[in-house]
Amino acid sequence: MRHRALAAAALVALAGCRGASDRPVRIGSKNFTEQVVLGEIAAGALEREGVAVERRLDLGGSFVCHRALVAGELDLYPEYTGTAFTAILKRPPISDPARVRADVAAAYAGQWGLVWSPALGFENTFALAMRGDDARRLGIARVSDLARHPELRPGFGYEFVERADGYPGLAAAYGLAFRARPAEMDLGLLYPALAQGKVDVVAGNSTDGLITAMGLTVLEDDRHYFPPYEAAFVVRGAVWKNPRVRRALEALRGTITPDAMRRLNAAVDRDGKSPAAVAREF
């Protein structure tokens, strides 16, 4: 009787392990074009290795995705080292990319058992942008130049306004005091609002495809406020142990240049292609 009970327990345990290993890898992303494209690229890479995936893309901001990963509701999602360093770990910005990556990798492994994949090959830092004609007319080329123009109307994403490494820290570092309260909106509405003249300055991302397409001027971060934002995937440790998952993500090391990421983003935002189609063509 005892032997049958032990055998039954062993079968239950084996079934549980088999179920966990057979479960599709759940891939998440934040809610803007680049993130969804990267999620699709990861999904395609895993599928080519014979790994079943479940796409949970376009979820929300950094905190939403991080909490889902820690809670075991996601298995991986694309993230940026600077975001992890300042927004998640609440550390003051530093400019050394190697140190940021090392500190982030150690902290994520120690606190949550999470692994950072090799860097994808590009950074996506915050970028303050203006209509090109306005920037030239007003002689604005650097973020510090904005301090002389409090009349300009800023427009920012919700997360940029809330994050310590976003607008609050930027305003303090550069002495910015716009007369108008920043208009807060979804990231996808920033460039249309700029094109329609509803705002004058937006905080986008340096790899946004519409920057070139719209002829915008990106202002130089002349006080080096923003930390490095290298792109990679954050993966649950148990999932990273799967050799096929690891092989798929390691194969993406250094494969996406900044220009390539801008082209991928533009193919979605300007040309109207789906993120899935763009990822397949990558």
Residue positions per predicted region:
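Alpha-to-beta junction loops
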Residues: 70-79, 150-153, 169, 189, ...
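A bilobed periplasmic-binding-protein/Venus flytrap-type ligand-binding module shared by bacterial periplasmic
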Residues: 126-136, 229-242
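Beta->alpha turn/N-cap motifs
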Residues: 58-62, 72-85, 100-101, 131, ...
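Bilobed "Venus flytrap"/periplasmic-binding protein-like clamshell domains
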Residues: 24-54, 120-192, 273-277
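Bacterial signal peptide processing site
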Residues: 18-20
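C-terminal motif of bacterial Sec signal peptides marking the signal peptidase cleavage site
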Residues: 14-16
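Ligand-binding "clamshell"
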Residues: 88-117, 196-201, 210-224
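An extracytoplasmic/periplasmic, membrane-proximal ligand-sensing/linker region
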Residues: 34, 159-173, 244-282
